[in-house]
Amino acid sequence: ARENSPTRHRSSVDTEDTGERESFLMGMYNIANAQAERSVPHIDLSGRAHLLDLGGATGAYAIHFCRHNPGLSATVFDLPTTRPFAERVIADSGMADRISFVGGDFTTEDLPGGFDVAWLSQILHGAGFDESANIVRKAAQSLVPGGLLLIQEFILDDNRSGPQHPALFDLNMLVGTPEGQSYTRQELAGFMRNAGLEDIRRLPLDLPQGCGIM
């Protein structure tokens, strides 16, 4: 707070150290895999054909969504440095014929289009308010008419005082990122509304650690 800048830098996929990068990705995969087992079975994607897993890293969610929806294919969009590890995980899952990987930076580059589902899991908290709004706008623009956009985040109460885990995670983003933060339901809904989306609501799922899906 005194310096108005992060006090430390998190491990990330954008590092030249291959071992550090794969360690980070494996950690993210293990977390995402455990979360996906709880959330994906309760999300109805029947009739949907092509999912964008934005910032999907190793494709853990794409893998689970495809397993639960036999007619679904998916594209994971993440940094090019993620590709080798992601493609190995996807191949090991037996999904290489249904899940592809596109390398790029969703904060600075346009996204491919033609999707009828976009899945944004735990990527907005690493970005500031304006950047998060722009990410949601890009994701919405990648959808065909009638497309569905889903955002999974640690969601703060509207007064920002809780629940405990999203509030503590908000502090973690303060010390670890330039502008990252946890967001409230109203803020996430605002991003979606300003991106031209309709029928915005939080799904009635009981997920751990204050996690929610819009």
Where do the protein language model's features map onto the residues?
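Conserved Class I S-adenosyl-L-methionine-dependent methyltransferase catalytic core
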Residues: 1-49
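Alpha-helical subdomain
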Residues: 45, 50-214
